[in-house]
Amino acid sequence: MSTRQKLYRCIPLIGLLLTATIAEAIPSGAAVPKAGSPVFVTTAGQSADAHAVKLLLDRNKIAAGYDAIAEADKISGSKSLFLVMGGSSKGLGAAGMNEDEEIARITHILEKAKKEKMYIVGIHIGGESRRGALSAKFINLVAPQCNYIIVKQDGNKDNYFTKLGEKSKIPVTVIEETLDLVSVFKAMFAVK
């Protein structure tokens, strides 16, 4: 068999390997919708996950404001609101608030975002550890009101977000790792 024939036999295999590699890098679920910037990022439950989201936006040069304890008036002028869901009793204590105060803060933020027709994105990257009773209060408040949801696979083992998306017609993207947010953000904001 000539070298050329060997090469031709390898081409389908190379194509298959490339396809598999690319498929692993693309999150599963709904097609990634477009969102406008600037973005405002805040937490829904005072977990530190919102700060990680802000850092990934910054590293990809996507204009984003951030305040873990922002009140509703602070989000004005934003085109998209990223609410990072996950309850943390430590975070609530550090912010000097209780669950009810955080729920009230998030409720006012959601009302303001809807009034200003912002694109609301719910993000859950805390995994299984951010799916307890405390987190459930914030997830149940935020997720049904989102235009789009991004969830890390280990935080969706019970398919809560997937089922909610199907029931409420909310697109849901499931990612493997937090860093997979980068490809989602690049698609959302057409960043190369």
Predicted features along the sequence, with ranges:
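Bacterial N-terminal signal peptides
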Residues: 11-24
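A short, gly/pro- and small-residue-rich
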Residues: 93-116, 165-172
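Charged, low-complexity C-terminal accessory regions
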Residues: 26-33, 40, 151, 155-192
